[in-house]
Each structure stands twice: as structure tokens, then as C-alpha cells.
Amino acid sequence: MKGVPLFLLLTLVCSAEVRLPAIFSDNLVLQQRSGNPIWGWAAPKEKVTLKTSWGETYSATPGSDGRWMVVAYTPKAGTGHQITVKGSNEIVLKNVAIGEVWLCAGQSNMGWSTGNSFEAEKEAKVNLPGFRIYRSAREHWH
């Protein structure tokens, strides 16, 4: 009976797939002309390869905790890129943009929605096709 939990643990570790945090998804924006850390999880010692549509390839080997990271260097601004992360499985990030990344943080006013604005209908109709927003699901960071 003592061997069953160990067997289950080993089964989970051996069948681990490459995973990425939610921030790395389709429509991702990376800072142009710089090194961008990209990380995730995989089975310990599994080779993880990251290939970009702009011709760069990186590889990493997760430690005993399954964590891995590479620093992907980006070209000048552009859109329509793709990033493929491969280990025992494959994840393809589509419609990746390279450009300027702005991080906005603050107090409660950072959660102000367009619907609460003075001219909400007018603001909602603004066409900004190159503008992408990522909002963290976490509301409190303390």
C-alpha cells in the first residue's frame, strides 16, 4: 500500500506536458528589440524547444521542480508572428505582436471600465486594431 502513492506521483511526473502560464497565449505582445523571458513547466529533464517565426530557436531543460525559462530576443515591431513551444506536446501561440509593451498598475482607479467613462459609447467605438490589452485575473496583489 505504501508504494501506491509513490507510483501515482511518478505517473503524474512522467506524463507531464509542457505548460505555459496564462500570460503567454494567442495575441501576445512582446517588447521589440529586447530579451523577453518566456517560462513554463514540463517534466523534469525533458527537453523544451521554443521556435519563433522570426527565425530564432531556444531550448531549456526543466529542473527537478519542472520549471524552465528561455530569453527570446525579438526583432523590430511587427505583427502576425508565431511561437511554438515543444516538449512531449506542442503549444503554438498565434498572432503574436512585437512592439511596445506598457505595464499599467495602480490603485482602484486602474479597474475603471470604459462603461463608467463620461463618453463611454464614443470611446467604445474607437478603432485601435494594433492595441492589445491583457488584464490579469487576479484583482489583489498583496
Predicted regions and their residues:
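Sec-dependent N-terminal signal peptides
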Residues: 3-13
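Cell-envelope and extracellular/periplasmic
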Residues: 17-142
